[in-house]
Amino acid sequence: MTTFRELGLSDSLLQSVESMGFEEATPIQAETIPHALQGKDIIGQAQTGTGKTAAFGLPLLDKVDTHKESVQGIVIAPTRELAIQVGEELYKIGKHKRVRILPIYGGQDINRQIRALKKHPHIIVGTPGRILDHINRKTLRLQNVETVVLDEADEMLNMGFIEDIEAILTDVPETHQTLLFSATMPDPIRRIAERFMTEPQHIKVKAKEVTMPNIQQFYLEVQEKKKFDVLTRLLDIQSPELAIVFGRTKRRVDELSEALNLRGYAAEGIHGDLTQAKRMSVLRKFKEGSIEVLVATDVAARGLDISGVTHVYNFDIPQDPESYVHRIGRTGRAGKKGIAMLFVTPRESGQLKNIERTTKRKMDRMDAPTLDEALEGQQRLIAEKLQSTIENENLAYYKRIAEEMLEENDSVTVVAAALKMMTKEPDTTPIALTSEPPVVSRGGGSKKRGGNGGGYRDGNRNRSRDGRGGDGRNRDRNRDGRNRDGNRDRNREGSRDGNRGRRGEGQGRPGSSNGRGERKHHSRKPQA
């Protein structure tokens, strides 16, 4: 393992890193930082949870001259949440060097951002639309920028930000250094690299290095109409301290959060149609524990860093395997254990295989719990808590009443009454969620799998390949935000000012695409 002291970082940054409790660099950090400190362009392929923020953040901060009152580096991120998270991380790392960091993103008052820009920040972290907005207003000048970071470049492609990114890169000095990080390298991202980067060092963290040993992963085969009852039974059995439930569309998130509240769970949802103030309010309540279940879309959850998340429930299977890795990365952090559950409908077995190939890890099968099993599971959890109380607490104050009860009742009856009082009675309030179309992918079919419970998948052959219809046109209907040419649709989450009408994340008429029709997987051809 490589220590941070071996990487050639300045003393002030080492002081910050050590105060944060880090000594050894992760593989992506150990390979990236030395090249970046030499000024080389970098293409880093890494998933969430690998430490890539510090991989680009440390060399970025190391180059900053705090005596200069100008913007010297920009970090471009796909979502507001990720921009905020990266900004907070860079602030912690650059604290002892006194580097001024400013996050800018849609949904925040632009006049407030203009006032903050006049205070001469050294590094800007922002979403493409809002950065470009400030460039066009001439409230952000990039003539002194030395380093540009593209974080989660493939996600920015998916959201249609390619034109904005090209416009920003055209506005910075030709001599700047570019650090591009992306889980995958589709052709439009490769063209960006060819056009704007000079002999980049390609650093790739293999999938086996990004799977998360602290996370137990299970899948459940369940019909679409039964998913909600299965979810509530799992919540009753597992009693998570903090849980995130992922839905594929905004409509799904709204309906799920409302349905969970009807069944007695403290739940709220976040997605791109919420104002920034509302999203921050929901996240604050979740961190404080006043909300026990957070329901989120993939885009809204990007960059979330919430400690203490014990369970992740993939209510809808994600559209792509990379999103699955991002989702489950919300748990199992800082050495703690986490549990991830994936709901798979009969026609989605091919997508499950795609996820397993990407993570290089076979998931264990779990049978969907029955109502009786949910009640018994609750009782066993309560029994464990009672046993822990017996072993660890002083019960002297309670024994007199207990002895009086035992004079009139046998001990089994007393314990049974205690279990009944502490067990949540099942709520069978009727819930009708709008069905979402399955994510059908190549690789399905009838195969027997091992794991906990075994069982067969649907033996019917999948009617489409790679999500395409019989005419070969792509029908992945719920991916976030790409229009036909891979460029940004302005009526979508993450628009320039965050206030325009937004669609996307599968919102639209039931059974339709995300409002923009079928997508082609290409972007505008870069200019020579």
From Swiss-Prot:
Residues 214-374 form the Helicase C-terminal domain. GO terms for biological process: response to cold; RNA catabolic process. The keyword Cytoplasm applies. It is found in: Cytoplasm. Keywords: ATP-binding, Cytoplasm, Helicase, Hydrolase, Nucleotide-binding, RNA-binding, Stress response. A motif (DEAD box) lies at residues 151-154. Residues 458-506 have a biased composition (Basic and acidic residues). SMART domains: DEXDc (SM00487), HELICc (SM00490). GO terms for cellular component: bacterial nucleoid; cytosol; ribosome. Its EC number is 3.6.4.13. It catalyses: ATP + H2O = ADP + phosphate + H(+). InterPro entries: DEAD/DEAH_box_helicase_dom, DEAD_box_RNA_helicases, DEAD_helicase_CshA, Helicase_ATP-bd, Helicase_C-like, P-loop_NTPase, RNA-helicase_DEAD-box_CS, RNA_helicase_DEAD_Q_motif. ATP binds at A46, Q47, T48, G49, T50, G51, K52, T53. Residues 33-203 form the Helicase ATP-binding domain. A motif (Q motif) lies at residues 2-30. Residues 518-528 have a biased composition (Basic residues). DEAD-box RNA helicase possibly involved in RNA degradation. Unwinds dsRNA in both 5'- and 3'-directions, has RNA-dependent ATPase activity. Oligomerizes, may be a member of the RNA degradosome. Belongs to the DEAD box helicase family. CshA subfamily. This is DEAD-box ATP-dependent RNA helicase CshA.
